[in-house]
């Protein structure tokens, strides 16, 4: 990625890649694959590393995420709470209508800022 301060190597377990991209002081975690009880610890570790380093805005991009279960939702809620304590914010980019419905039905969209695409702002 041109102009990126740091493109972290993909951290991977079977079924999930999490790539951390830092650019112009912002942090983006690109999540590719399925987030479930097996893969959620990877997301938790990478996300909390960023939360501890950056009390600003952390963006989690779920564009290439095909599934997220309650374990994955819990990881996002926990990270959002941690960032809130530090006066930061977690934003989740989730263009998939199916995944947005999961966020809405679970009530997680009331706890985590979810947008449909990166241009939706907030």
Briefly describe each language-model feature range.
Residues 1-66, 78-122:
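STAS-like cytosolic regulatory interaction modules
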